[in-house]
Amino acid sequence: MDFTVKPRRSLIVYMHSMKQVRQLKRFGLIQYQSRKEHYVVLYMDESQIPAATTKIKKLNFVRRVEPSYRPDVAMNFGERVDQGFFKPTTTGAPDDDDED
């Protein structure tokens, strides 16, 4: 019995009112909700994203739906540091040794 990781992704759902948050539970796991900025982060399987997006957009309390781009971003920053992409700048405060 092998364990396989299912690819998952978040959907950011912007809403007019936060009263209907409970209706979004049937689409996936509510990972975060911001009452001040009126959005909900839903977490679900990658294969369910297209179907869920079209269904959620049809709801009258939803302003817009955006997928999360985090799975598309390469998270291996060690190679970029080795290539010199993140070079530290030496424009800081002058050293005290230069005044002598």
UniProtKB/Swiss-Prot annotation:
<dbReference type="GO" id="GO:0005737">
    <property type="term" value="C:cytoplasm"/>
</dbReference>
<keyword id="KW-0963">Cytoplasm</keyword>
<dbReference type="Pfam" id="PF09902">
    <property type="entry name" value="DUF2129"/>
</dbReference>
<comment type="similarity">
    <text>Belongs to the UPF0298 family.</text>
</comment>
<protein>
    <recommendedName>
        <fullName>UPF0298 protein lp_2135</fullName>
    </recommendedName>
</protein>
<dbReference type="InterPro" id="IPR016979">
    <property type="entry name" value="DUF2129"/>
</dbReference>
